[in-house]
Design a protein with these regions (language model features):
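Intrinsic low-complexity, intrinsically disordered or marginally ordered coil/linker segments
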Residues: 1-154
Length: 154
């Protein structure tokens, strides 16, 4: 949140007129434009000095509904010598991707995929990153068990 800090809210946050902050009168539209998602993420990061004049920061975080691409774009503009690569997945909305500061966004939807067809839709590196084939196989197995139970009940 230090690269694009949340604006301080005015009094009466939910009623009446709000002060404009960077052209926004509410936290939601400000966050969506500046972070690319509605929440500031709870971040878990590890810093490693590569002992060659570079460093690596790795970690994970949860965000709401979308990867915070706008936040990473802002960070990469502030630190032009910084290369950023972000893998993301939203299992409830069935999308996955990889964004980097040099090549942009590699985004895929997989709502129609099965454990057998996922690699036809999604590149292997993303399937492996998130174990999509294994997770879909587990889901399919659970669905089959539920159907079998329903048939017994009926």
């Amino acid at each position: 949140e230090t690269t694009s800090p949340t604006p301080q809210p005015g009094q009466g946050n939910y009623k009446g007129e709000q002060p404009l902050v960077d052209g926004h009168d509410n936290w939601y539209s400000w966050a969506a434009e500046n972070w690319g998602t509605k929440w500031d993420p709870e971040v878990h990061l590890e810093f490693t000095d590569n002992e060659d004049g570079t460093a690596t920061i790795q970690g994970w975080f949860d965000s709401a509904w979308a990867p915070p691409i706008a936040a990473f774009e802002s960070l990469s503009q502030d630190w032009d010598s910084c290369y950023i690569e972000m893998f993301y997945e939203e299992s409830g909305m069935c999308f996955v991707g990889c964004w980097d500061s040099e090549g942009g966004d590699d985004y895929y939807e997989y709502s129609e995929a099965t454990s057998k067809t996922i690699t036809d839709i999604i590149p292997k590196y993303l399937v492996e990153q998130f174990a999509l084939d294994e997770r879909l196989a587990e889901y399919e197995e659970e669905e089959a068990e539920e159907e079998n139970l329903q048939e017994i009940v009926d």
